[in-house]
Amino acid sequence: MAESQTLYQRQLANLEQDLKPIMAELLDERVTDIMVNPGGELWIKRFGEATSYSGRIVEREAILRIIMSTAALIDKKVTKDQWNLTGVVPKYNARIEAFIEPTVSSPTFCLRKPTLLALSLDDYVRDGRLSSAHQKLITQAVTDRKNILIGGGTGTGKTTLLNAMISEIARLRPSDRLYIVEDTPEINCRAPNFVSLVVLPNESIKAVRSALRYKPDRIIFGELRYGEVALEWLKASATGHPGGMCTIHADGAQRMLPRLRDLLLECFSTAVPLNIIYEAIGLCVYLREIPDFGPRVVEVAEVRPGLDAGGNFQYETY
């Protein structure tokens, strides 16, 4: 045990050394994405800004060392036959996607960092990323303990907004106990009473089920990707734990519930009983990346009970 711990610490020290070419970006709280192309060009995405070229070139060997050091720490191999690395960089909790030859002309990787920004909903309004009307709807939903879905595409700031909503819970309901489940450590909770679990994707169902024995007031899930997990979260939210939140990939406020329905198809041999969705979800908040501006809440939809004459979900959209 001691030997393995010593090996891990040595490998971590090696990784720290190898990360020096991008360490400034790793430690910059506004940086969300670090991209190194096969030619070594270092591109940076900062929250609220367009992706920009840093003007720097990272040498091929430095790129390869970052990939290999990360792989060694997370017990994965990268070779000419296993040319892809997917994982999380230890200590920094940044998601890494990397390729080496022969799939690419030269080693390349992309890092997605967990947000370090501590923004409030007031900050979003001040920066023009959230209208006062939308803020009022979100705040009322938090107060009324409605379940909230936060949707958008990749890199639209869903988790950053989720963190701001958690801060709103802490402000309005500081005694509420939060139970947080995610498969990558990205949620930055500032509530006084919470338990946060980081689990493998195949352990998410167990983690959500265990929530019921942990006396939570609200259950918060990082991102819904799988039907069984979504079903467990919906069931938990409908059995005495309202006021939860989670993120989901969708291209509009009115596309979130259909997306959730599509995930649930994994769990049902026949049609999904849609009432378990519209009875559980109260508000859908949709973010979009605005060119040269960054993420902005562009649509909020209140879910209405029942279905329309065509069997579709009903909303009041703002």
Show the residue positions of the predicted features.
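Hydrophobic anchor at the beta1->P-loop junction of P-loop NTPases
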Residues: 150-152
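Conserved AAA+ ATPase "sensor/coupling" helix adjacent to the nucleotide-binding pocket
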Residues: 115, 260-264, 303-304
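Residue-level signature of catalytic and energy-coupling elements of molecular machines
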Residues: 34, 98, 241, 281
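Switch/coupling sub-region of P-loop NTPases
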Residues: 145-148, 160, 164-280, 286-290
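N-terminal anchoring/assembly modules that precede and organize ATP-driven motor systems
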Residues: 1-53
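P-loop NTP-binding catalytic core
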Residues: 41, 45, 51-144
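Conserved glycine(s) of the Walker
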Residues: 157
